[in-house]
């Protein structure tokens, strides 16, 4: 039985910098498109996201910036929330891992894992700064590479030769912040024995959706699981109940943020127990959207943590991964100057242009590349030349000739064939959305626009108008507007603003959108939406949907 309740989460953006196009197309646009599609299907959707606000990268960069940790994450939490809004990401609640509910549930996860013998303490040697009076994690350490001798190697990897190692393996290790020499000291940490859950995890991943090319990677990762430290010597983080001066590793606490974020949402709507109907009900369908670099944590580690709990937390049903989006052949990097200012871009180009192109080139099974030339080509050829042209020419002709009120006319077989083909493409689009393929959905959108253009060209109503055959003209316009109604429906998850403009211009009488949130259209993708027999349209002066990109 198909679930009527859908839980959607996407990887929590790290509160350590602005989001770029790679982040958006990797996790947040796909999640938003899926959420919009499922709402159209009439499902009860909850899309949760939020900022990941702990970890060494945050403490180090906050200190380098001369800012307090909370001040630093507050800045990026607001920035990420604003970015979601600008990009039309219809998240239902944007929380953060510094929320009120997070510490208690993280500590509860830990205690449950301890009670089941899955977490054990172990003494290891780590680098200690006498001057600073604390252990230093790898990001705080520099030294001489044990492989090539480079004297400014990082604590986890040598940027000169590419070698990776433990920070304690560095020669002449020193503090990155003060330059003080470091020594080795014993310290006690808690380790999660993931290898003890290998068989459970292998069985689990066999039953979930993964992109085909990821399944072997995930299986191999689980086969080679080993214990992982869940604690760190830091002051910024969730305190560990039974280890003094320790906090939880960010990889341990961050995914629990999906649950605490849902608790945060429940409190915000005045129903503190509402989170349970999504996290403690196995009939819910749970889809998680992430970049490929987060796969191991979400396919193995977080499910292992859930398996070790006393409460039956919902585990993911579909783990939807994306590869990397490159910019002109290189990874997005603000520090290297290889990035696009998102605010400046959106001041120049419409949001739906960006959403469409990012969806059309989505790195679903392999890395893909964003280039301005492809952006320009797709906008001008597809959005202006095919899509916008179809909508504009039909409405302009209808308004010019006074055919603004259309109702179901007498149709010929070729009209019925056209309607049937249009319906088939709309149903194809639904299948693509259901299978998490933005690329195929974009192709189908353009295929439907091309079908409509072809029909309008072939039937040439302007010739019939000259002959005075207005009944036939109205029949052609009716069929073209019906096609545009379907085009708006299948476009909405990717281009919501454009879809709403089309529906406003053709004004199908079967729809009453006045009471709906335009960002969360609900229950439109129904059999009645596809029924044309009783449909009527009240056409308005066309508004240009897209302009050429110079």
Curated annotation (Swiss-Prot):
Q: How is the cofactor bound?
A: Binds 1 zinc ion per subunit.
Question: Which GO MF term does the entry hold, naming one?
Answer: ATP binding
Tell me the residue numbers annotated for binding Zn(2+). 145, 148, 158, 161
**So which cofactors does this thing need?**
Zn(2+)
Q: Where is this motif: 'HIGH' region?
A: 13-23
Q: Where does ATP bind?
A: 334
Q: Mainly resides where?
A: cytoplasm
Keyword Plastid assigned to the entry: answer is no
In chain numbering, where does the motif 'KMSKS' region fall?
Answer: 331-335
Reactions catalysed according to its record: tRNA(Met) + L-methionine + ATP = L-methionyl-tRNA(Met) + AMP + diphosphate
GO terms in the biological process aspect are:
methionyl-tRNA aminoacylation
Q: What family classification does the UniProt entry report for this protein?
A: Belongs to the class-I aminoacyl-tRNA synthetase family. MetG type 1 subfamily.
Query: What is this protein's function per UniProt?
Result: Is required not only for elongation of protein synthesis but also for the initiation of all mRNA translation through initiator tRNA(fMet) aminoacylation.
Protein name, as recorded: Methionine--tRNA ligase
Taxonomic path = Bacteria, Pseudomonadati, Chlamydiota, Chlamydiia, Chlamydiales
User: Gene encoding it?
Assistant: metG
């Amino acid at each position: 039985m198909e679930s009527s309740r859908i839980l959607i989460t996407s990887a929590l953006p790290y509160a350590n910098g602005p989001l770029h196009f790679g982040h958006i197309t990797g996790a947040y646009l796909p999640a938003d498109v899926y959420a919009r599609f499922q709402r159209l299907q009439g499902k009860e959707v909850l899309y949760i996201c939020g900022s990941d606000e702990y970890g060494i990268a945050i403490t180090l960069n906050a200190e380098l910036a001369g800012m307090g940790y909370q001040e630093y994450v507050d800045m990026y939490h607001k920035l990420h929330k604003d970015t979601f809004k600008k990009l039309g990401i219809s998240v239902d609640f944007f929380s953060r891992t510094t929320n009120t509910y997070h510490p208690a549930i993280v500590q509860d996860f830990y205690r449950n894992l301890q009670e089941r013998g899955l977490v054990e303490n172990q003494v290891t040697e780590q680098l200690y700064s006498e001057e600073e009076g604390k252990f230093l994690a790898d990001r705080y350490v520099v030294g001489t590479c044990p492989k090539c001798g480079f004297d400014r190697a990082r604590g986890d990897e040598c940027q000169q030769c590419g070698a990776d190692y433990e920070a304690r393996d560095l020669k002449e290790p020193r503090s990155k912040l003060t330059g003080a020499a470091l020594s080795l000291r014993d310290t006690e940490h808690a380790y999660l024995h993931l290898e003890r859950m290998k068989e459970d995890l292998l069985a689990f991943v066999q039953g979930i959706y993964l992109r085909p090319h990821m399944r072997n990677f995930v299986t191999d990762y689980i086969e080679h699981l080993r214990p992982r430290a869940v604690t760190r010597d830091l002051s910024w983080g969730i305190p560990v109940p039974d280890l003094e001066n320790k906090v939880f590793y960010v990889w341990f606490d961050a995914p629990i943020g999906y649950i605490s974020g849902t608790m945060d949402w429940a409190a915000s709507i005045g129903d503190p127990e509402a989170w349970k109907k999504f996290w403690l009900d196995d009939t819910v369908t749970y889809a998680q959207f992430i970049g490929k670099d987060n796969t191991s944590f979400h396919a193995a580690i977080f499910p292992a943590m859930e398996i070790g709990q006393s409460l039956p937390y919902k585990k993911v049903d579909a783990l939807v991964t994306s590869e990397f989006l490159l910019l002109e052949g290189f990874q997005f990097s603000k520090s290297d100057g290889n990035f696009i200012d998102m605010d400046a871009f959106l001041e120049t180009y419409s949001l739906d242009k960006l959403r469409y192109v990012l969806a059309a080139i989505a790195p679903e099974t392999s890395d893909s590349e964003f280039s301005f030339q492809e952006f320009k080509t797709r906008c001008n050829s597809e959005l202006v030349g095919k899509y916008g042209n179809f909508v504009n020419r039909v409405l302009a002709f209808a308004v010019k000739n006074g055919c603004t009120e259309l109702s179901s006319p007498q149709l010929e077989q070729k009209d019925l064939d056209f309607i049937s083909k249009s319906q088939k493409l709309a149903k194809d689009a639904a299948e693509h959305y259901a299978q998490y393929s933005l690329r195929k959905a974009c192709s189908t959108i353009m295929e439907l626009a091309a079908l409509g253009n072809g029909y309008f060209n072939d039937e040439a109503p302007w010739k019939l108008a000259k002959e005075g055959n207005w009944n036939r003209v109205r029949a052609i316009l009716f069929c073209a507007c019906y096609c545009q109604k379907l085009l708006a429906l299948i476009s909405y998850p990717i281009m919501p603003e454009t879809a709403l403009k089309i529906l406003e211009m053709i004004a199908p009488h079967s729809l009453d959108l006045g009471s709906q949130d335009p960002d969360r259209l609900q229950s439109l993708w129904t059999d009645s939406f596809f029924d044309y027999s009783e449909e009527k349209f009240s056409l308005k002066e066309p508004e240009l949907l897209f302009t050429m990109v110079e």
